[in-house]
Amino acid sequence: MKLVVGLGNPGKQYEKTKHNIGFMVIDAIADSVPHTTWSEEQRAEVCSITVDGEKVLLVKPQTFMNLSGESVGPLMRYYKIDPSDVYCIYDDMDLPIGKLRIRPNGSSGGHNGIKSLISHIGTENFPRFRVGIGRPLPQWTVIDHVLAPFSEESQEKVQKGIKDTVKAVLGTLEVGMDKGMNQFNPKRRPQR
């Protein structure tokens, strides 16, 4: 069994914000494949899908971003899921809007939701699907940036990023992290 966790903030007022790209991807995964009814479990909205014969829980913590680990840690322990089987989808300001980067592990990179997961999971060794939300405008704070909706002009990139991430998550669930990273990470241009 695997957990696929999308990070975000609960509530209508946060629904379309950049910080909620993880929730948007989870919803798009659920819209693309048959799934069970959503239910509340360990302070998260949870449903299950089946990928390649394996049960996968789709998870949207309802604790607010900075406390996400308080939901994910207990879910992981309840279902006896190894950290390497907890796939986390979240926003990344260091990537251009809609761009995806998959990593098998790593530090929080200053992301408070990831800091909370690391604290409650007990390790940095869990897979990440980072979705770009771009850098804030010079006059904006980081908080203003992540809690603002995507601009109208960026919607095409956002929707493509969500679609690409859905494909990457489902594909990686089928082929495993190493092959998934090779297949779905952006290809680097050779150095000249």
Language-model-derived ranges and their functions:
Residues S108:
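Conserved TIR/SEFIR loop-to-helix hotspot centered on a Trp-containing motif
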Residues K2-N105, K115-S119, T123-F129, P136-T141, ...:
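Nucleotide and nucleotide-moiety/phosphate-recognizing core
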